[in-house]
């Protein structure tokens, strides 16, 4: 909750330092390794938001860690014990999370490849296909929206107006389709995901509806899209988004 609202505080650094304190307490007092791992990641995120990248590397290390297939081992063990439903759920959740990690990681790398248009375009195409095939706009709309915005930003940096506009069209269309209150849940394919989300994660969005709507609109009006300021289609997109979010113009 602190991480989701720290930017709204008059003293954001104080809030982030509080996050660090809470994470340290979990690491010192908990015997649950999963909680400890989550605390380490959240503490590192708080440091990154404070502009402390060197400290983040000290906490997490500087290299990619090898994934040893823990989830597959646990699922196989459950199956050997006759716990078929548990095994299926673990594999579904693992597949869902790895699919999202692929999209999020690819999205994060986009702006690092702006000077390499061939690689940039290929990444965009591959992630677009993943989003479509895995129904990501319904499963985890934030992952899809973040990708569309990052892709649009990269295209704008390359001064490619048509491609920038296309990504913003996808962004706007997805925003308009959002059903509030925003929740996380599975679908017909990930049919065991919803129960896991209810057990392990709060399915409700961590921020209130009006804050989400305000940010959805503000994100479509970033300075990065200055090259479209006089474009009629872009102006129409923004007006349409304002209408569907039932918001007045954000100053």
Residue ranges and their predicted role:
Residues 4-9, 42, 46-47, 77-78, ...:
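Residue-level signature for tetratricopeptide repeat
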Residues 102-231, 235-236, 240-251:
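Alpha-helical protein-protein interaction modules
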Residues 24, 41-45, 61, 72-76, ...:
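Amphipathic alpha-helical repeat scaffolds
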Residues 12-28, 51-64, 84-97, 118-135, ...:
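Alpha-helical repeat scaffolds
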Residues 30-40, 63-73, 97-109, 140-148, ...:
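Generic helix N-cap/helix-start motif at coil->alpha-helix transitions
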Residues 2-26, 205-209, 213, 219:
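Short coil/linker segments at helix-helix boundaries
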């Amino acid at each position: 909750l602190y991480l989701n609202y720290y930017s709204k505080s008059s003293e954001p650094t104080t809030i982030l330092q509080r996050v660090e304190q809470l994470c340290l307490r979990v690491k010192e007092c908990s015997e649950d390794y999963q909680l400890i791992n989550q605390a380490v990641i959240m503490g590192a995120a708080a440091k990154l938001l404070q502009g402390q990248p060197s400290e983040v590397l000290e906490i997490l290390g500087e290299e990619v860690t090898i994934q040893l297939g823990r989830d597959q081992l646990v699922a196989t063990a459950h199956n050997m014990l006759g716990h078929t439903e548990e095994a299926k759920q673990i594999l579904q959740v693992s597949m869902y999370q790895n699919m999202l990690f692929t999209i999020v990681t690819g999205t994060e790398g986009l702006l690092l490849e702006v000077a390499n248009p061939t690689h940039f375009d290929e990444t965009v195409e591959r992630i677009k296909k993943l989003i479509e095939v895995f129904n990501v706009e319904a499963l985890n709309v934030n992952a899809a929206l973040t990708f569309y915005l990052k892709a649009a930003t990269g295209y704008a940096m390359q001064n490619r107006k048509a491609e920038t506009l296309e990504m913003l069209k996808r962004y706007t269309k997805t925003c308009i389709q959002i059903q509030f209150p925003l929740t996380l849940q599975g679908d017909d394919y990930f049919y065991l995901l919803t129960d896991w989300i209810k057990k392990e994660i709060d399915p409700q969005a961590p921020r209130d509806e009006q804050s989400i709507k305000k940010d959805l609109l503000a994100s479509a009006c970033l300075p990065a899209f200055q090259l479209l300021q006089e474009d009629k289609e872009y102006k129409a997109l923004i007006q349409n988004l304002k209408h569907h979010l039932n918001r007045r113009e954000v100053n």
